């Protein structure tokens, strides 16, 4: 089916003569066959958002409908790849066309020439259905790739073709003539089905103490990370990609500056995976849409990333989907909405911004897959609020749809406190659900310690305001002890070095032991001050400096060091009280 162009407005064009077309159908626009998607239908007229630059299009040029929705290719070869927002392989396109891509450039997302050794797990006569395991695809230098039956497919196996196969060649034939290849296609806007959702009672461990202990998120949960320029969003996301409890990382760079994306593309291949010792990129899929790329492709990029994440989830993997940033995605949505002449909402964003964000974040979750395995997609969405204003619409809509806020503070970043997570603003809605896991796995009393630490930090904020007015020396020893204990907690526990091998990640058991010792120091020093021991004498023991060095110790050495420090603390305080 084909029509003709009758109207153009930036990336949005209108074609007539497409009476049989459907919503979200992919079309090819103009003589250069630019990729587009139908977003509105009125009679035989279709409004199309074009995923490439539309300059030079002329009225009357042909528009050809494909009969298919916008879909991604899923199969062996995804890991380690870099795509744009509509899953065009950027490295292959750069090799063919140079650093600047021409319009209409198109290549299959997965390499059709590469052969994979297919080791089948089914035999003729077996009955298979969606989610069932077909086998494993292997290739030199690539991780093993589990091949599963696409959702909605059911049948009895009539023939199995093992051995060297390309991704588009039939590997399993079913009765009735249906064929299954290593490759499948899936519409990006349609969530992949699962057998059932599982309760969110297992944490998504990030390796960052401030997140895991104070603001945990469940596996399959959602978190929003608002932060202005220079607050460390990219470094935090790299730390999460490297140390978080995820088998696969899908990183979506949505509308960020080209220089920042170039830096990410340059640094990610050099990051070492601590699990395997190989490059981190080997278990990462990157989707890159810089701010100078067409806004329509920016809008589609987060759905492309989500479809890929759900595909790996259906293999029984834990997937971390990181979007940087949803603000740029919302700005693309605002621009497209304005081109469509829709009624604007707050700050010009479309009125359906909240429902679109909620529908997207609802695709996260920990599930039992159709094949009976357990998989999860955990979403971490960065937000770039103008001027750090958390009351703007994108941040507020994200907060209503997600389970945690990890707010990054410019003030902490300027003080070189990383991760610059502001504990006075951040929150989690899942702390109570995950408390049982931390009590079992980290240590009994974990929740009580966390609450005590947060009260200490809150008390420090109150006293800091008083100290600014009257000076620290005017405070009583008990109040100055609160300031000192909170300083030790901030610098020795909440702050973490991404460059220190022992401190870059922290298991829950180490974090529990550290937190218990910090708070024990505060309580026992408080008792000594109450008994008349001068605070200066307690500080002169040097035990505070030893507390700060706990973070630099490997996890296995922390219990012994903590026991020695606890004994020295008892001895020092007993001596001071006896004097």
Swiss-Prot record:
Signal peptide (residue range): none
GO molecular function: ATP binding; proton-transporting ATP synthase activity, rotational mechanism; proton-transporting ATPase activity, rotational mechanism
Function as written in the Swiss-Prot or TrEMBL entry: Produces ATP from ADP in the presence of a proton gradient across the membrane. The V-type alpha chain is a catalytic subunit.
Family of the protein in this entry: Belongs to the ATPase alpha/beta chains family.
EC number: 7.1.2.2
Keyword Nucleotide-binding: yes
Gene3D superfamilies: 2.40.30.20, 2.40.50.100, Bovine Mitochondrial F1-atpase, Atp Synthase Beta Chain, Chain D, domain 3, P-loop containing nucleotide triphosphate hydrolases
UniProt lineage: Bacteria, Pseudomonadati, Myxococcota, Myxococcia, Myxococcales
A GO CC annotation given for this chain: proton-transporting ATP synthase complex
Known catalytic reactions: ATP + H2O + 4 H(+)(in) = ADP + phosphate + 5 H(+)(out)
Disulfide bonds: none
GO-annotated biological processes: proton motive force-driven plasma membrane ATP synthesis
Protein keywords: ATP synthesis, ATP-binding, Hydrogen ion transport, Ion transport, Nucleotide-binding, Translocase, Transport
Annotated residues for binding of ATP: 227-234
PANTHER family reported for this sequence: H(+)-TRANSPORTING TWO-SECTOR ATPASE (PTHR43607:SF1), V-TYPE PROTON ATPASE CATALYTIC SUBUNIT A (PTHR43607)
InterPro entries: ATP-synt_VA_C, ATP-synth_a_Xtn, ATP_synth_asu-like_sf, ATPase_F1/V1/A1_a/bsu_N, ATPase_F1/V1/A1_a/bsu_N_sf, ATPase_F1/V1/A1_a/bsu_nucl-bd, ATPase_F1/V1_b/a_C, P-loop_NTPase
Top class in the EC scheme: translocase
Full protein name: V-type ATP synthase alpha chain
Highest taxon listed in the record's lineage: Bacteria
């Amino acid at each position: 089916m084909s029509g003709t162009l009758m109207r153009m407005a930036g990336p949005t064009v209108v074609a007539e003569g497409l009476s049989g077309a459907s919503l979200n159908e992919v079309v090819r626009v103009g003589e250069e066959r630019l990729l587009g998607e139908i977003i509105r239908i009125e009679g035989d007229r279709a409004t199309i958002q074009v995923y490439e630059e539309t300059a030079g299009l002329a009225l009357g040029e042909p528009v050809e409908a494909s009969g298919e929705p916008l879909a991604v290719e899923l199969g062996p070869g995804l890991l380690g790849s870099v795509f744009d927002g509509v899953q065009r392989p950027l490295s292959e396109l750069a090799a063919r066309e140079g650093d600047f891509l021409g319009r209409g450039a198109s290549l299959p997302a997965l390499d059709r020439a590469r052969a994979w050794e297919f080791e089948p797990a089914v035999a003729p006569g077996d009955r298979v259905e969606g989610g069932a395991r077909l086998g494993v695809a292997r290739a030199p230098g690539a991780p093993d790739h589990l091949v599963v039956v696409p959702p909605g497919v059911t049948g009895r196996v009539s023939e199995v073709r093992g051995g060297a196969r390309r991704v588009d060649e039939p590997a399993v034939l079913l009765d009735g003539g249906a064929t299954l290849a290593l490759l499948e296609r899936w519409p990006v806007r349609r969530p992949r089905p699962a057998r059932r959702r599982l309760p969110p009672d297992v944490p998504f461990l990030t390796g960052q103490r401030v997140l895991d202990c104070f603001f945990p998120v469940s596996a399959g949960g959602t978190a929003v990370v608002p932060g202005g320029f220079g607050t460390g969003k990219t470094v935090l996301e790299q730390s999460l990609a490297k140390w978080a409890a995820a088998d696969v990382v899908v990183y979506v760079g949505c509308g960020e500056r080209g220089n920042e994306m170039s830096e990410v593309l340059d640094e990610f291949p050099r990051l070492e995976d601590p699990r395997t010792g190989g490059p981190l990129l080997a278990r990462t899929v990157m989707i890159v849409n810089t701010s100078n790329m067409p806004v329509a492709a920016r809008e589609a990029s987060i759905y492309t990333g989500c479809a890929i994440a759900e595909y790996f989830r259906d293999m029984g993997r834990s997937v971390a989907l990181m979007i940087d940033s949803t603000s740029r995605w919302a700005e693309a949505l605002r621009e497209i909405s304005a081109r469509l002449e829709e009624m604007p909402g707050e700050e010009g964003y479309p009125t359906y911004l909240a429902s679109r964000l909620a529908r997207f974040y609802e695709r996260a979750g920990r599930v039992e897959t159709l094949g009976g395995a357990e998989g999860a997609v955990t979403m971490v969405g960065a937000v770039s609020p103008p001027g750090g204003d958390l009351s703007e619409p994108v941040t507020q809509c994200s907060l209503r749809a997600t389970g945690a806020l990890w707010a990054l503070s410019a003030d902490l970043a300027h003080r070189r406190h990383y991760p610059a997570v502001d504990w006075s603003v951040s929150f989690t809605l899942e702390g109570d659900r995950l408390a049982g896991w931390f009590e079992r796995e980290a240590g009994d009393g974990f929740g009580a310690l966390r609450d005590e630490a947060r009260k200490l930090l809150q008390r420090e904020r109150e006293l800091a305001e008083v100290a600014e007015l009257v000076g620290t020396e005017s405070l009583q020893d008990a109040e100055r002890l609160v300031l000192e204990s909170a300083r030790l907690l901030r610098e020795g526990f909440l702050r973490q070095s991404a460059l220190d091998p022992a401190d870059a990640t922290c298991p829950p058991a180490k974090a529990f032991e550290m937190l218990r010792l910090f708070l024990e120091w505060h309580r026992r020093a408080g008792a000594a001050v109450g008994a008349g021991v001068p605070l200066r004498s307690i500080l002169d023991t040097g035990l505070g400096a030893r507390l700060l060095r706990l973070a630099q110790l490997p996890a296995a050495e922390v219990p012994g060091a903590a026991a020695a420090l606890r004994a020295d603390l008892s001895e020092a305080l007993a001596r001071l009280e006896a004097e």
